Regions:
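Short, well-formed alpha-helical segments that are part of the catalytic scaffolds
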Residues: 4-19
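Glycine-rich, basic loop-to-helix element that forms the pyrophosphate-binding segment
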Residues: 48-64
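Short aromatic/hydrophobic "clamp" motif used to bind/position activated sugar donors
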Residues: 69
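Acidic donor-binding/catalytic loop of UDP-sugar-dependent glycosyltransferases
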Residues: 35, 74-88, 159
Length: 217
């Protein structure tokens, strides 16, 4: 779990994960100045790294000893029995995948948006990190881990992963935080996300795009 100044959410998120047996919990802090590290240490192994989600997730992967790596964002709420669903998918031969999502503040309009996004994800196998990406550890290292770019590392990683083998979007639904949309304005944020993703797919530098993407903490 990559974190930076997440004292409001870290404890609740880790309490859920700690309640599931058989998980090795690793929190990678990118330089928090609040109580994030102290709270996380009650439930997980905490390491530090330079800031940057890709850098932090790669650092956590190097510390992990399991056969499956599972990258969970602090503001993603996982469905019941999520670990067993991940294990079952890998046992079926998938090299990785992620969960379906909906927002944690649903409305008919935003349910439609997430339904369309789930459909896109199922077709193209491009997973955002808010979907709690999982991957076989050996496959993760074969493809070189997350590209250490400042933005859309999850999309770039998905491209590499789908070339390595079969991936799956699970039907089980994880709740994605609406906080980014609430802070920036829902429609404005939706349009910005679409523009930034389209620009990235056209080859615009992720370093340039990262400057346009606001931190919501």
């Amino acid at each position: 779990m990559p974190v930076l100044n997440e004292e409001k959410l870290i404890e609740g998120s880790l309490q859920v994960l700690a309640g599931w047996p058989g998980l090795e919990l690793i929190v990678v802090d990118g330089g928090s100045v609040d109580r994030t590290i102290r709270l996380a240490a009650r439930y997980a192994k905490v390491i530090t790294s330079p800031p940057g989600r890709a850098v932090q997730m790669n650092a956590g992967a190097r510390e992990a000893g399991g056969e499956i790596l599972w990258f969970v964002h602090v503001d993603t709420t996982l469905p019941p029995d999520a670990p067993n669903q991940v294990r079952a998918a890998v046992a079926e031969g998938f090299v990785g995948g992620a969960f379906s999502t909906r927002f944690d503040e649903p409305t008919p309009f935003w349910d439609l948006i997430t339904c369309l996004d789930n459909h896109r994800t199922r077709i193209f196998h491009v997973y955002f990190g808010s979907r709690a990406i999982f991957v076989r550890a050996d496959t993760f290292w074969e493809v070189g881990g997350f590209p250490e770019i400042p933005f859309l590392e999850d999309v770039a990683f998905s491209r590499k992963l789908r070339r390595a083998g079969r991936t799956v979007m699970l039907d089980a639904v994880a709740l994605e935080s609406f906080r980014r949309f609430r802070k920036s304005g829902p429609i404005r944020q939706l349009l910005l996300d679409m523009i930034l993703l389209g620009a990235f797919e056209l080859g615009v530098s992720p370093w340039f795009l990262a400057r346009l993407y606001k931190d919501v903490r």
